[in-house]
Amino acid sequence: MAFYGSLLPIHYQPIDWVDSFRKWNQIPWYQLGIERRADWVANALVMIPSAFFLTGAAYLCYPSWPIRLLLSGVVGAGLMILVPVIEFVQLWFPPRTVSQNDVLAGWIGVVLGIGMWWVFGHRLIRSFERFRSTSDLERQIGWLVGAICLGTIAYSLFPFDLVTNRQEFHEKIRLGRLDWRFFPKSFASFFTKEGPLLSLMKLLPFGVFLGLRSSKALHLVWLLAIPFLIELSQIPIYSKYARLSDVFAGCVGAFLGWWLTKSRERWIPWVDRWWFWRGGWM
């Protein structure tokens, strides 16, 4: 996956080996402007799953802690070697940018992936075991929706290209990525990939998640707060749109999800089907 993600779009161009080594010896170190920052972060993110799951495989196969630590080091060393190899192969795929920055980003991703397993891996295993062992359908739905909520938060922050100075922030405003209007500019923009309809759909799982919890007045506060906090978190991310109309649409989606859970006696029997769970995990 790391190789495939690092070579997209696949556009092979043959290069002589002598030229490839000459270019490799001259790969630059770039000053990371806002245009390159998202690509740099992506190079780190693409290595995290490989490091995370390979460390997890070693963790599960060997019960001895010293061996687990040793194999984590082996995984880290192997992926650290793989990162510059991938960067070297990118010389044959000219749409890809080859730089020392990307090598550093890949190494950071390896360290983060291994560290994330050691911090969260055991909890993830226990949660998955509880999910499989329980026969409580509502609890299973709650875990599935909770995972969707975490994915939504990650999507809302991706590609993590934070603005670092006032000029970049003004450029984001100039591009129309901050909008304080209560309604979208046009009806057509409501259905775009960055429009309010997407915000409504993104926040619907949060309403379902809160609705499945015990009924508390505080949950209603969270239904209003979560859409606002998500949009607020997107303000310092250069490529993300933060709009008041999305806050309103998100609140509608959250309350819609909450309302669906309050009438779940009508639809929850349909959820207890094999095709629902297969589709949910896909």
Question: What kind of region is each of these model predictions?
Answer:
Residues 1-282:
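Bulky hydrophobic segments
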